[in-house]
């Protein structure tokens, strides 16, 4: 199973998510749980479409780090 890093951002009305390694792979949801489900589905569909078009599937390369600042 391949794991891609996902960035989730909260806005006043919903959550947005995007995948740094998959250009254009984005999703939204009203709750954190909903956006997680939606981005997982978006990744699956994105990869299927890339395969159908004969595109190279990128290996995950983005890394996540939490940086503390004063």
Where are these regions (language model features)?
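Short aromatic-glycine-(Arg/Gly/Cys) micro-motifs in beta-strand/loop hairpins
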Residues: 7-19
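Short, flexible active-site-adjacent loop segments at beta-strand->alpha-helix junctions, enriched
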Residues: 12, 23, 62-63
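Short, surface-exposed helix/turn micro-motifs that flank interaction/cofactor sites
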Residues: 18, 36-37
